Amino acid sequence: MTKQILILLWAVYSITANSQTFEGFITYKTEALNPEPTMIPDSIWQQGVKEQFGDRTYMLQKSYYKEGRYTSEIDAGKEKGFLTYNPEDGFLYSWQENSDVAVTINTKTNTDEPIKIMDSKQLDTIMGIPCKSIIVKSDTGEMVLWYNTDYFRVNPKLYKKHKYGHWNRIMEKIGCLPLKTEQKKFMSHIVQTMIDYKEMEINDKIFQLPEFKEIINAK
């Protein structure tokens, strides 16, 4: 159960959507960096990361997007899981491989308010794609998102009710999926970077939820 909740919480940093424009998949590499190097010896931090994710020390998330829907295959090294957004009820469903128990979060609500979104001068190049960035500030921390409006465009109207993770406001601001995200909160420093992508037709069946024996609302 702890693993399920962990995967769902990681969705805050990696949460992505799609649009009528982009249909396909993006694979992200997610790293948990030392949030307090002056307080936590890096050797101890890396040991904890290896215990969580194995020798690879990072998580892979392959996300499929189509017409306002998204679903992800999550490889956390020692654990594998799934994350699916259901636009019909507005919930995110997270579950482990071979499990019939899901943990959900209501994306129509967001307790992390207020926020401020502003343009940033930070630039980066991800997989040969030049990116500019925005900064999202909230009560609990700060997030930087790198993007290029020529790639992975979305229709913000599809996410106007998707308040969780401030996704509705982020999509309204940039109108596309981010290629890189860095989020810093109390004792947390997560970096997620695109390492692969492909525009392709996605079968609707991939977004279908399995039958669960138990559904736990995390909020």
Regions from the language model: what does each represent?
Residues M1-I26:
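Bacterial Sec-dependent N-terminal signal peptides
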Residues T21-K219:
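Extended soluble regions of mature proteins
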